[in-house]
């Protein structure tokens, strides 16, 4: 014991310093080891999140592509076919043309003039209305697809446990998804009467100073079509034309449905209306309509010799020949392809899908 006490007295400072260093070193080792484990856990967590993100992107793209395929191969072709059939039913020019054809030598000049004026109004109404409807319907369905794609992203992310999306609104069920896509028929079923009436008023306003003997050139016809579209779009309340494309928000509430179901479908309609009434969509619609109007007149020019000028009366039968081109099925529809290829349209839908409100 004396030896130990002696050693302690003699080396106490060294022993204390050594013990302190060893203790500190052990503590630092434990802290470093704990920190290393935390870093490793964090790296594994980040790796899992990255893996989940890739799974989300893959599944989202697969399902989104499926929705897009359904829209392109089923929804849009059906909607356009239904639309073109309704236009033919509601704007009948064949009966007037038959009267003119069978009335040669029988009709008095005033009767003949009246029929020709009716044909003038109906032909332009039918052509411009068809062009407007096909253009806007194609854009509308693409808006639908992008909105569904956004909700699909939320659905997939929630299924994989992405916490930052767990507080989103209720998921969109398959029945609501199908109901939403089939609402594209609203234009042909419910919106058509008002659309025809207002488009015809715009045609009458623009053509009231044009006589059947007036000669129209390519530029004059193009200006006439654009003027009709402009008068139609600008007459009435702002974005009045949205009511031709889709049902009102109040109409989406079905008293026989559960509150949850009503909320889900109502949400889709609300988001769609917000997009359609935005300035960005209005700009894209205007660009698309102008592009299609120019293409339509150019097509008529190549087939009729319009470049050198043509009397309005002789132009009317040529206008009727444009109908199959305007309402052709999507795969063969030149106008739909032109719309899809517009840089402004591509950018709009890219931003719409990327920036859908979360």
From Swiss-Prot:
Pfam families: Peroxin-3 (PF04882). One of its GO terms (biological process) is peroxisome organization. GO terms for cellular component: peroxisomal membrane. The gene is PEX3-1. Its main location: membrane. Keywords: Coiled coil, Membrane, Peroxisome, Peroxisome biogenesis, Protein transport, Transmembrane, Transmembrane helix, Transport. It is found in: Peroxisome membrane. Belongs to the peroxin-3 family. It comes from Arabidopsis thaliana (Mouse-ear cress). Residues 33-62 form a coiled coil. It is a single-pass membrane protein. Disulfide bonds: none annotated. InterPro entries: Peroxin-3. This is Peroxisome biogenesis protein 3-1. It comes from the Eukaryota. Involved in morphology determination of peroxisomes, but not in import of peroxisomal matrix proteins. May act as a docking factor for PEX19 and be necessary for the import of peroxisomal membrane proteins in the peroxisomes. The keyword tRNA processing does not apply. The chain crosses the membrane at residues 15-32.
């Amino acid at each position: 014991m004396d030896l130990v006490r002696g050693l302690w007295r003699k080396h106490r400072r060294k022993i204390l310093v050594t013990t302190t260093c060893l203790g500190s070193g052990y503590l630092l080792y434990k802290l470093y080891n704990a920190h290393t484990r935390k870093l490793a856990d964090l790296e594994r967590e980040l790796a899992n999140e990255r893996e989940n993100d890739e799974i989300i992107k893959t599944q989202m793209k697969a399902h989104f592509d499926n929705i897009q395929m359904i829209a392109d191969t089923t929804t849009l072709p059906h909607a356009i076919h239904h639309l073109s059939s309704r236009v033919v039913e509601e704007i009948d020019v064949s009966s007037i043309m038959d009267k003119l054809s069978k009335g040669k030598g029988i009709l008095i000049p005033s009767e003949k003039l009246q029929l020709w004026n009716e044909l003038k109004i109906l032909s332009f109404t039918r052509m411009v209305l068809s062009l407007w409807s096909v253009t806007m319907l194609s854009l509308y369905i693409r808006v639908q697809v992008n909105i569904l794609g956004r909700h699909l992203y939320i659905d997939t992310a929630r299924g994989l446990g992405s916490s930052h999306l767990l507080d989103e609104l209720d998921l969109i069920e398959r029945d609501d998804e199908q109901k939403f896509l089939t609402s594209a028929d609203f234009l042909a079923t419910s919106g058509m009467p008002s659309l025809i009436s207002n488009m015809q008023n715009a045609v009458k306003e623009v053509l009231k100073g044009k006589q059947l003997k007036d000669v129209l050139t390519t530029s004059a016809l193009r200006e006439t079509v654009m003027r009709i579209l402009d008068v139609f779009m600008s007459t009435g309340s702002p974005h009045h034309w949205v009511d031709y494309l889709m049902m009102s928000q109040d109409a989406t509430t079905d008293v026989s449905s559960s509150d949850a179901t009503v909320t889900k479908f109502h949400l889709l309609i609300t988001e769609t209306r917000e997009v359609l009434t935005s300035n960005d969509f209005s700009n894209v619609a205007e660009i698309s309509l102008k592009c299609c109007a120019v293409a339509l007149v150019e097509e008529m020019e190549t087939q009729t010799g319009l470049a050198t000028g043509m009397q309005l009366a002789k132009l009317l039968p040529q206008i009727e020949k444009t109908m199959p081109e305007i309402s052709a099925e999507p795969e063969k529809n030149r106008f739909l392809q032109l719309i899809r290829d517009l840089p402004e349209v591509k950018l709009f839908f890219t931003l719409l899908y990327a920036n859908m409100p979360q």
